[in-house]
Swiss-Prot record:
Gene Ontology terms: cellular component: mitochondrial membrane
Transmembrane spans: 1-21, 34-54, 63-85, 89-111, 118-138, 169-189
Record-linked Pfam families: Proton_antipo_M (PF00361)
Protein name, UniProt field: NADH-ubiquinone oxidoreductase chain 4
E.C. designation(s): 7.1.1.2
Length: 231
């Protein structure tokens, strides 16, 4: 069920990050060097999750692994125990909660019309559902963390924190962001461009689907313009 996937990616997955924040508050502040292996493991896990996204042929699996990769950045930012790192982690959890939930919603709208989640069979929706293509473009741009979205603000905070703590981590972080951009563009081009391979009759996008996307994107844009609401 798509509702379960949306709740899992938007809320339940972020509860793990909240738990790590609470646990780190009772850890000694001066011994951050001992967390270096965990930090490298979190960033390496994010890269592996991103590489797994590039190999996916199932649209829903791709979005699910995308959520996992972003949580790697959240864990790395929390481990350092700085105010900027904590703010960036909280902002990224909120921003990606909206983004991943919106992506799952869009994947379901595609599935309802094609009855398949295979990327190669869901192409050509740009010609059939142009408004849905606009939603796909906006959510993928948020997933890539393009300015002025909240995803960009949070990843900039995390990048600054990691670079100030250990400049070498920028290599792993840069690789992760590059692969994120690659699979997000791959997902958009695979589902929207090209010629449709299925000949079944496609329903137009319904008002409830547009409303659902507005309820995801508008709050995220509002928080992006006024991040003091959450940071």
């Amino acid at each position: 069920p798509i509702a379960g996937s949306m709740v899992l990616a938007a809320i339940l997955l972020k509860l793990g990050g909240y738990g790590i924040i609470r646990i780190m508050q009772i850890m000694p502040m001066t011994k951050t060097d001992m967390f270096l292996p965990f930090l490298v493991l979190a960033l390496w896990g994010a890269i592996l999750a991103n590489l797994t996204c590039l190999q996916q042929t199932d649209l829903k699996s791709l979005i699910a692994y995308s959520s996992i990769s972003h949580m790697g950045l959240v864990v790395a930012a929390i481990i350092i125990q700085t105010p900027w790192g904590l703010s960036g982690a909280m902002a990224l959890m909120i921003a990606h909660g909206f983004t991943s939930s919106a992506l799952f919603c869009l994947a379901n709208t595609t599935y309802e019309r094609t009855h398949t989640r295979i990327l190669i069979l869901t192409r050509g929706f740009h010609n059939i559902l142009p408004m849905a293509t606009t939603w796909w473009l906006l959510t993928n741009l948020m997933n890539i963390a393009t300015p002025p979205t909240m995803n960009f603000t949070s990843e900039l905070l995390i990048m600054s924190t990691l670079f100030n703590w250990c400049p070498t981590t920028i290599i792993l972080l840069g690789m992760s962001m590059l692969i994120t951009a690659s699979y997000s563009l791959h997902m958009f081009l695979s589902t929207q461009m090209g010629y449709p391979l299925l000949n079944n009759q496609t329903e137009p996008t319904h008002t409830r689907e547009h409303l659902l996307m507005i309820l995801h994107i508008v709050p995220l844009m509002m928080i992006s313009m006024k991040p003091e609401l959450v940071i």
